[in-house]
């Protein structure tokens, strides 16, 4: 019989954490346990977990603190504590519709998968600027259910993984990426290279309310820059396939050309709407992120 652990790494989001813990009590396929690892040395998540236990929870809850500011170490602690033979992961700012876990588990069986990813649906507040709502900046491409996911689209936030794959290493998430991010895609790309079959389930949606702090061009450019750095680092170490020296040179020349072209297109697009210009500016930022790997600079999103 399959057992399911639900893993949450959290950092100073008590209200959001309380909401997702409530969602998990209402799942049509309940988790056997929920593992909450608090990355806040002040233990801000502890009262939330205790309140959930007091109110009643149809699953066991394991709570631990990982005080060092590092998302990789925090996620590694969830894997260490989880006892299920399947591990599902959800972010502490996401909401889980009732059939979510059942859909992930059903997809794992139906497609004979070692891992299943689902969509994260951004919920943009109605008072967001018009150009933000028109730009669809927080959405990611979706695929047909059962499709094997390309390595450059692998990420956490809504994922189910067979525990045996994660337990192959004492530290499945790379601690060196714990302040910059990108540790999730790096891990799944490595598992895929080792033979794990990771597929998409388009029905297993979670919702992510977009926080007010993210409703700005500054945030969009910073996230694009980090995404470009992640992509370049993963590409250069062979996560997307081996690269020879000529391919490496071409990679960076392409990034330079794309950054220059997108700069011009952003200026041309501005009269057509701020959202069009912003889209091209995120392309500029992503390619600058790729180029910045050449001089070793890292944007530390979680520092």
Predicted regions and their residues:
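Conserved donor NDP-sugar-binding/catalytic core segment of glycosyltransferases
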Residues: 99-131
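Glycine-rich, basic loop-to-helix element that forms the pyrophosphate-binding segment
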Residues: 66-82
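Acidic donor-binding segment of Leloir-type glycosyltransferases
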Residues: 21-65
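Short, flexible, basic/aromatic active-site loop/helix in glycosyltransferases
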Residues: 118-119, 133-152
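Short aromatic/hydrophobic "clamp" motif used to bind/position activated sugar donors
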Residues: 87
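N-proximal low-complexity "stem/linker" segments adjacent to membrane-targeting elements
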Residues: 1-26
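Non-catalytic, C-terminal membrane-associated alpha-helical segments of glycosyltransferases
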Residues: 222-226, 240-303
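Acidic donor-binding loop at a coil-to-helix junction in glycosyltransferase catalytic cores
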Residues: 178-189
